[in-house]
Amino acid sequence: MRRILKRHDVLADEWRLFGEEAAGAVDSGSDALIVPLAELRKDTAAWLARPGRLGVRLAPSESVESLSDVLPHLTLVAVEFPGVGEGRGFSYGRLLRDRLGFTGEIRAVGAAVKQDKIFLLARCGFDSFELPPEEKADEALAALRRYDVVYQPAEPIEGIERQRFFA
């Protein structure tokens, strides 16, 4: 089972990925399902009409702006980080929060989600992280709390949000 770092806790993932179930059909009725953007675009209306929570998985080669029409219907956007040299996802987090006004969960997923990037991803608007199997949960949690003072402005973190990330 996938491990998710969220709100200073490591949790079992409550979301399923499209294709994990045998059928993988639009009308599967599963409560929380993440589908690739390409799959969502095959029949957007059917996916948006399905019961339960819907998330989309965004590859580095796909445009964040292409989500603008469906974003109000999504609960989660999972941004892929397939390799260490791929940094577009950092910008995707900021674009989702600042330009598109997405208030749902933004999750960093992929092999390159490592403890050295978690704090920086949080500053770019990410609020959950899928930990690769080789990552140690306690070290990932420590990485999120590593700095309590920053010198450059980024994602505005105020009030209860600040307490959540820096407590």
Residue ranges and their predicted role:
Residues 44-51, 65-74:
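Acidic (Asp/Glu)-rich catalytic clusters
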Residues 64-69, 113-131:
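Catalytic cores of alpha/beta
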Residues 138-167:
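C-terminal helical cap(s) of enzyme catalytic domains, especially alpha/beta-barrels
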Residues 124-144:
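Glycine-rich phosphate-binding active-site loops on the catalytic face of alpha/beta enzymes
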